[in-house]
C-alpha cells in the first residue's frame, strides 16, 4: 500500500461528525487508498440492486416501480456521485442484474428495470457490467449461443474513449438516436471511439457533429466511430455528435447551458 495505510482511509478526519451522514452511509472511506495523489488513478466499484423485487410477477406494481425509479434508484446513483466528490477518483457500476431482460417482453418488470438502470448509468456517465452466471443463462444458452432477446436490450451505443472531458451522453431506444456532448481537447491526437452495436444500427449509421470534429467509420471495426478534434479549431461551445438510423437527425444546440439542457430533455429518465 503506497503512501497511506488502508486503515488510515477509514479514519474520520478531525471535525467530522455523525451528523454529516458519512458514518451511516457511503463507502466508509475518507480518502482513496494511497492518499490524494492517487485520486486520478482510483475507481470506486459499486453494485446496484433494488431490494423489493417481486419475482413471481410479470409487471411492476405501480407503487413498486415508482419507489424503485423515483426514490430508491436516484438516491443510490446520487449517493455514489456525492461519495466521489468527497474522496475523488472515478466510479464503475461493476454489478447489476437479477432483472432478466427480453426484447420480446417489453412490459416485463425485468426488461423495464434493466433499461432503467442502463439509462440512469448513461446519465451519470457510468460504465456498467451485467451479472450473469452459467446457472442463470441470461446471456448465453446451454449450447453456448447468445440469447438475442437479451442482447437486444443490453447492447447499447456508448463512448469507449473521448478526446475531451465533461462528457454527457444519452440513448433513446425508440428512435435509436445516440447523443454525445463534451469539452474537446485539441492536444489529444488519438481518436476517440464510439461503439455502435450492429444489432441496433446495422448498415444504417448516420451521424451529424459539430464543426470542430472529424468523424469517420473506423478501419479496425465496422461498429466503431473515430472522433478527432480538428487542429486550430475554434469553438465557444461544446463539441457534439448525434448518431441515428436515418438521415434526419437533430442537432445539439450548445450555445448556452439552457439550450444544452433542453436538447437532452427527451432522453432524461424520470
Question: What label would you give each PLM region?
Answer:
Residues 110-195, 204:
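Extended, alpha-helix-rich binding/interface surfaces that flank or overlap catalytic cores
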Residues 169-270:
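C-terminal beta-sandwich/jelly-roll accessory domains of carbohydrate-active enzymes
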Residues 44, 61-66, 87, 99-100, ...:
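C-terminal catalytic-base region of ester-bond hydrolases, centering on the histidine
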Residues 48, 132, 209-211:
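Generic short alpha-helical hydrophobic face used as a protein-protein interaction/packing hotspot
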Residues 1-118, 122:
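Extracellular glycoside hydrolase catalytic/binding regions
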Residues 97-101, 135, 187, 200-201:
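Short Gly/Pro-enriched loop/turn and capping motifs at secondary-structure junctions
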Residues 62-67, 147-150, 200-201:
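Short, low-complexity, polar/charged sequence segments that are solvent-exposed and flexible
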